Amino acid sequence: MERIKELRNLMSQSRTREILTKTTVDHMAIIKKYTSGRQEKNPSLRMKWMMAMKYPITADKRITEMVPERNEQGQTLWSKMSDAGSDRVMVSPLAVTWWNRNGPVTSTVHYPKVYKTYFDKVERLKHGTFGPVHFRNQVKIRRRVDINPGHADLSAKEAQDVIMEVVFPNEVGARILTSESQLPITKEKKEELQDCKISPLMVAYMLERELVRKTRFLPVAGGTSSVYIEVLHLTQGTCWEQMYTPGGEVRNDDIDQSLIIAARNIVRRAAVSADPLASLLEMCHSTQIGGTRMVDILRQNPTEEQAVDICKAAMGLRISSSFSFGGFTFKRTSGSSIKREEEVLTGNLQTLKIRVHEGYEEFTMVGKRATATLRKATRRLVQLIVSGRDEQSIAEAIIVAMVFSQEDCMIKAVRGDLNFVNRANQRLNPMHQLLRHFQKDAKVLFQNWGIEHIDNVMGMVGVLPDMTPSTEMSMRGIRVSKMGVDEYSSTERVVVSIDRFLRVRDQRGNVLLSPEEVSETHGTEKLTITYSSSMMWEINGPESVLVNTYQWIIRNWETVKIQWSQSPTMLYNKMEFEPFQSLVPKAIRGQYSGFVRTLFQQMRDVLGTFDTTQIIKLLPFAAAPPKQSRMQFSSLTVNVRGSGMRILVRGNSPVFNYNKTTKRLTILGKDAGTLIEDPDESTSGVESAVLRGFLILGKEDRRYGPALSINELSNLAKGEKANVLIGQGDVVLVMKRKRDSSILTDSQTATKRIQMAIN
């Protein structure tokens, strides 16, 4: 009432009415800015102004029953005045303090589960070690980094489906949880969050942090794995760095690291096989990393590394459009070129055929320890600005750029012949020949490059052929800068093609990647990598090859047995026996093979000489191309444990030991599995019992297809005929009986009939 009187009073003064009705508000824009929309225009000011009031908060009326009017110090916690425009009460910030100290405690069981990423971070920081602070110039370059430790690698869409299913299971909308990773996560989270009282929106936010990789393009001068990025603000400034060792590892970093190691091993191994692309795919599909299929990780994981990208390209996935040369990632930032074949002469008068890029182009080069910008014309380096951690890294970048420029003085600096080969003993292409040559020794290259006087430019310094810095002179076109070059920020992916030699090209035919670009660095993987492919058996040395070969035969014994009797040549050519050949002394491989194959042929021909253990033991030796000779062997040598060890043709040895009573096979003392000999093998009897219900018709008849094993017979329909393999490696034709009544007589007649059929 009082207020209204006051306003009336004001309005009665003629000047007030005139101002309010006649004058133009010339700053309508300003008024609009501060009065339209619900978005707060100056939040910090608003906050300060609000908090300066006595009761800046509104709360539900129930608060008056739950919080006392005054605290222990006698300060008022809430006002008896109602909030204008709602039926809430005005509350002091002190009430919040009181509530936090004295309010009711609900169950906290869900907090560590919902806020898992925060709890984990606290643990990592608690156990982390912060070292001394060093003051020095920081060469930071922007890289795309993972800012969210401890996440799974779901796509945004997959994560959205999981979150909806966990947090809002009753919402309408079709959600199909299909991927390997979605199902276990959904199940686990539903169980963890039963009866959770935390607001669903908060739970959804936190789940997103756990499920999706979040990347940012940040300036970094050190470690780039997510456990380093989360403390970036503590470990590097503009002119200082603080040493830090994380207090724990997270699975996403471990996966990234192990993926790179697995991919490198696989590409290196595939490159030396007969069909690299097929081998690579076979290995990617049969490898697991930390229990997850490698192909699933490749589909979800955005890691960009040469070997990983080759594997992705082989699977038909898109990869980054930048290309790799000499371990540096090149991204063209401007210009264009056309390719032309040209023959050039090295300083040793060797002719090289190189594909010359004609035209002016600019590139960024980003390596692990150095970065650069390169401007080049046709076979001419115009300018190279390098920055790096140390002299060595800077030199590496300069060599790569000089070779990439294809300048004549570089080609003329070659001393001696270029004959570098890759792991498969094939000659490298000319550009990689040159690169390898100068990576070994770049002295002549730097001496012959040429020197120029330089102007004094801030932040830039010259570099002499012996890699010492100078402010007066520098190698032609080359400068060292304090500033790093940012990594290519785009996450754009392009469609690529790959040939059988694992060369990856973009749609215009430019080679982006090849096995030569895969790093030779060997690390130890954080997660267990399980290579099921026989091609990777040798990665853990000769013993692993030996054990794996025999385990493979035992696991596949049923099929191996049939092939042994039906199509031995196919069996001998199986790729699973390839690694074993490296254990057999080269000079005698052929003789061993000829001997074993002859022995096996006798077993096939002479009834009752079939011997499971002996076949398994000698089979890998039959895989080498055989040499016919009259030589007989009582033992065969394999190179393991740094020396030749003997496998006895008849009987046990430390290498191959079969215990008839326990049925266990041990290879070099390691258990290789259970080996079930065929029944009555020793007594050359017949598996008559197993043939009950079948009538033996006579010798094998090829029209009825390949021989079945005894186990497969059960699938025959009554009256159906089939060839069957019996214990001794002999094949007979049988028919499944139409009536069950005569089964008893089968086993008696079977014995006679088999003898007749075979003889």
Curated annotation (Swiss-Prot):
GO molecular function per UniProt:
RNA binding; RNA-directed RNA polymerase activity
> What SUPFAM superfamilies does this protein's entry cite?
PB2 C-terminal domain-like (SSF160453)
Per the Swiss-Prot or TrEMBL record, what residue ranges does the short sequence motif Nuclear localization signal cover?
Answer: 736-739
Q: Which InterPro entries match?
A: Flu_PB2_2nd, Flu_PB2_6th, Flu_PB2_C, Flu_PB2_CAP-bd, Flu_PB2_middle, Flu_PB2_N, INV_PB2, PB2_helical
What Pfam family does this protein match (any one)? Answer: Flu_PB2_5th
Assigned GO CC terms: host cell mitochondrion; host cell nucleus; virion component
Swiss-Prot/TrEMBL GO biological process terms: 7-methylguanosine mRNA capping; cap snatching; DNA-templated transcription; symbiont-mediated suppression of host cytoplasmic pattern recognition receptor signaling pathway via inhibition of MAVS activity; symbiont-mediated suppression of host gene expression; symbiont-mediated suppression of host mRNA transcription via inhibition of RNA polymerase II activity; viral RNA genome replication
Coiled-coil region(s) = none
The protein's site described by Mammalian adaptation is found at 627
Where is it located? Virion; Host nucleus; Host mitochondrion
What are the alphabetically sorted keywords of the record?
Cap snatching, Eukaryotic host gene expression shutoff by virus, Eukaryotic host transcription shutoff by virus, Host gene expression shutoff by virus, Host mitochondrion, Host nucleus, Host-virus interaction, Inhibition of host innate immune response by virus, Inhibition of host MAVS by virus, Inhibition of host RLR pathway by virus, Inhibition of host RNA polymerase II by virus, mRNA capping, mRNA processing, Viral immunoevasion, Viral transcription, Virion
- Mind telling me which Gene3D superfamilies this protein's record contains? Polymerase Basic Protein 2, C-terminal domain (3.30.30.90)
- Name the job this protein performs: Plays an essential role in transcription initiation and cap-stealing mechanism, in which cellular capped pre-mRNAs are used to generate primers for viral transcription. Recognizes and binds the 7-methylguanosine-containing cap of the target pre-RNA which is subsequently cleaved after 10-13 nucleotides by the viral protein PA. Plays a role in the initiation of the viral genome replication and modulates the activity of the ribonucleoprotein (RNP) complex.
**Subunit structure of this chain's protein:** Influenza RNA polymerase is composed of three subunits: PB1, PB2 and PA. Interacts (via N-terminus) with PB1 (via C-terminus). Interacts with nucleoprotein NP (via N-terminus). Interacts (via N-terminus) with host MAVS (via N-terminus); this interaction inhibits host innate immune response.
Which protein family is it in? Belongs to the influenza viruses PB2 family.
Q: What is this protein called?
A: Polymerase basic protein 2
Q: Which organism is it from?
A: Influenza A virus (strain A/Swine/Colorado/1/1977 H3N2)
**Name of the gene encoding the protein in the UniProt record:** PB2
